[in-house]
Amino acid sequence: GDVYKRQICIGVGNEGEGRTHYSGQLISGNVLDAELAIGDYEPQISIQIWKRAMDNARIELIAPTGERLVISDRNAGVVHHNIKNMRIVSKAYGPGPFYMGEEIYAAMVATSGYITSGIWEIRFTVENVLDGFFNMWLPPVSTLSSATGFLRPSPEYTFTIPGTSRRAICVGANGRAPGSAATFSGRGVNVKSGLMLYAKPDITAVSYTHLTLPTTY
């Protein structure tokens, strides 16, 4: 905007009430369990976990049937598991020269039928941490069963790429009541939290009961 006198505006997406994001803080020596409900008829699902690379924790998936599967450990590398009619593959990425975070990506794929439905647990057995903040995301709500999602979701950090760009104007949606936000509207944060240090969205716009121009004249 300073150079070309132009500005890019990007919508925040519709993940605000989708139960697709979980945010928490790890504490040295503690165990943290995040519960994930998986509904019927899910052929596959992925989980992205973002944390500080210097925060050390063993991460397990615990199936509704009780199987415990390590998806990330200090020396795990690429991890493969096969249980019943499912294949689970996970890998850690990062850190890099310009980013000290780490991503753990886990893919759960049914080899026949569907993923085992029920309450899964993602367990963090924590060794030592610097600040402990972490975030987890599921795929977009539009691709999931309505029964699938975290049991204790966080509406923060639900704005979507490319709205995460620092220099673009990120636009959220107003709610029906004056001064409120639409529940479906993706959200950023307004305080220092985890790996992000800037607030989003930048502005909001009308989302209910407004008139639009016709497509033909």
Place the predicted regions along the sequence by residue.
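Active-site glycine-centered loops adjacent to acidic/histidine catalytic or metal-binding residues
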Residues: 13
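Short acidic/polar inter-strand loop motif in beta-rich domains
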Residues: 126-135
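Single conserved hydrophobic/aromatic residue that forms the stacking wall/gate
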Residues: 1-4, 210-217
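Low-complexity, Pro/Ser/Thr- and charge-rich linker/hinge segments at domain boundaries
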Residues: 141-155
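Extracellular S/T/G-rich loop segment that most often corresponds to the catalytic His/Ser-adjacent loop
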Residues: 7, 18-107, 112-116, 124-125, ...
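Glycine-rich, aromatic-lined ligand/substrate-binding cores of catalytic
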Residues: 123-125, 139-143
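Short, surface-exposed beta-strand/strand-loop-strand elements in extracellular ectodomains
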Residues: 61, 135-138
